[in-house]
Amino acid sequence: MERKRRTIKNGILFVLIGLMLMIAQACSTKPSTSNESASKQEGPKQGGTLTVVRLSDATKLDPHFITDIPSANIVYQKVYEGLVEPDKDFKIQPLLAKEWKVIDGTTWEFKLREGIKFHDGAPFNADAVKKTFDRLLDPKTASPQREKFSMIKEVKVVDENTVQLILEYPYAPLLSILASNEGSIISPKALAENPDSLSQHPVGTGPFVFESWKTGQEISLKKNENYWGKKPNIDRVVFKVVPEDATRLAMIETGEAQINDQVPVTEIDRIEASDKMALYRTEGLAVEYVGFNVKKKPFDDVRVRKAISHAIEREAIIKGVYNNVGTLANEAMSPKVFGYSDKIKPYDYDLNEAKKLLKEAGYEKGLKVTLLTSDRKERINMAEVIQSQLKGIGVDVKIQVMEYGAYIGMIEKGEHDMAIGGWGNATGDGDYNQYNLFHSASQGPPGNHFYYSNPDVDKMIEAARRESDEKKRLKLYEEVMQKEIDDAVYVPIRNYEHIAAYSKNVSGFWLNAASYLMIDDVVIK
């Protein structure tokens, strides 16, 4: 993918090369046809509206309050940008910051690009960066993302185009968290005038400008004609909510839409057999699991959690529900994330041990529980398989299916018994999994939907945050993840593989490892 940010130096170089080529062509006696000349001048086709069909609508569009991928996918690298960004290999590259250096272990200095404006005309500068992070870190803001940046002690404006982040302690994955959606820089004008409106009307510096949101129907973004970098080829992108799986694919085939960014595995054969559609597959950084609300009975008893962990046949879910798309997970961290360990041992499938544990917990005659899931087809199928499996130990499972936004609301309030869930990693670093999923400070909206609290686990997670030695960090993550499994907080199910369908008339898009749709270079034929 062509880098969309170019320095002035590179621009001058390209101009000189272009002049030399023109001179060489003028001196040549070889004739060229008009078609050849036209093809050299045309470049990527411009214009058109990209329609992306999705199962679920966004819940909010303020990056300081977004806690789900469907919402982040609307604004990340489209409306909003951060100081840095990950490339296709998840290596950090400059974005709004053109360069940076570590002055000492706890002071990071960023030199900012000049001449950039937010969509509302406000200038991008060091003060804008400070205002964004001051708002995020202010306890009064009550952002669920605050703890992810809690290592930042102060944001210091050095001059108009230089800003320093002063940390409480050395934090190795700082650039990775700055490259996430949570690190988006927000217009200071919008923050000052009406910060509450950012939930429905985002204002950033990105290649697309927010246009409209018809709740439950569609969100529209238009091309930023004043974008500071390489402008998008398309005029507009519309994210359209279409709950029915078959209808979304039919819209791709008929040309009503170009991308379906979440496709059930049962539709793979249909897509591959189509002459209008193509299949996009990529390994992601997400893990799917069954999680227990450990503050609610009967899951406040570890014996009950262990019993159910022993009674879920995970391999059968991978094969029967997912058709072997994705791989069996052994922990709440993808193998592609720094911190993963293949030494973590989940509970074996053992019905006799499960029954024994239930008897010890006082449930020899069985019990009734509710299993919550979102309305994704595979999640519902998984719930039905688990319901059937748990009958074998006398557990009567009621399945509760909710639209995605309502599902998120319920688990963030802790109103569920057990839930099928997933966690995507936006940084590629284990801290994003461990701190958000298991630290006591992250209970609720930040990500700890297990409502798990263990002082020893908290200490190990915090130690891994502060440790700069990679081998020591890996050892800490290995120890803490086995402890979480031993406490039976969740049952790991699947390492995620993202599947999308797209029209053969569209090119240039890709999905990054965090499952974000990247459309900077999209061309509609």
Segments from the language model and where they lie:
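Periplasmic binding protein-like
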Residues: 52, 121, 388-439, 476
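Aromatic- and charge-enriched surface segment that lines or borders ligand/interaction sites
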Residues: 98-142, 158, 164, 298
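Bilobed periplasmic-binding protein-like "clamshell/Venus-flytrap" ligand-binding domains
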Residues: 172-178, 204, 360-378, 415, ...
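Alpha-helical secondary-structure segments
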Residues: 51, 125-132, 160-166, 206-207, ...
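Short, solvent-exposed loop/beta-turn-alpha elements that line the ligand-binding surface or hinge
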Residues: 42-44, 66-103, 138-139, 180-212, ...
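Surface-exposed binding/hinge segments that line
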Residues: 101, 147-189
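Ligand-site clamp/hinge motif
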Residues: 224-270
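Append "and occasionally in soluble cytosolic enzymes with long acidic Gly/Pro-rich linkers
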Residues: 223, 273, 280, 300-388, ...
